[in-house]
Amino acid sequence: MNTQDQPVTASLVAEAQRLDFLPTYFGPRLMMRGEALVYAWLRRLCERYNGAYWHYYTLSDGGFYLAPDLAERLEIEVDGNGFRGELSADAAGIVATLFALGQLAAEIAGTDAADALIDRYHFLRGFAAGHPEAAAIYRAID
């Protein structure tokens, strides 16, 4: 039997489900830290970022990400790898979420919660491969 892999899709979290999103994906103990890390990473990566409303997305493979509600493209600069480029707010949110997941998993290494975050990191990284800005996302997180 020939089965094709289904592409991973993202779904915007409805307003009524937003309260459940952070504890579901970061865990109840880490939800505040995880959310704050995503915002902090975008501030670190984008000098001109000065806050925004953030959308929450779930992925059909169990992953997730956050992305700011901004129309303009963001100039992203990653000191650690020399990446500099413009990304859409959606792609910048993916990058910020990946960095936040990596940092948070490292902070709690050796725990079941860290293992769950690592899985979610890989789910999101896999989703990014099909994103229209995949090449720039991968260069940013390299």
UniProtKB/Swiss-Prot annotation:
InterPro entries, sorted: Antirestrict (IPR004914), Antirestriction_sf (IPR042297)
Q: Which cysteines are joined by disulfide bonds?
A: none
Q: Which superkingdom heads the taxonomic lineage of this protein's source?
A: Bacteria
Q: Which UniProt keywords apply?
A: Plasmid
Q: Which Pfam families match?
A: Antirestrict (PF03230)
Q: Sum up the protein's function in the record's words.
A: Could be involved in overcoming restriction barriers during establishment after conjugative transfer.
UniProt similarity note: Belongs to the antirestriction protein family.
The name on file for this protein is: Antirestriction protein KlcA
From the broadest rank down, the organism's phylogenetic lineage runs: Bacteria, Pseudomonadati, Pseudomonadota, Gammaproteobacteria, Enterobacterales
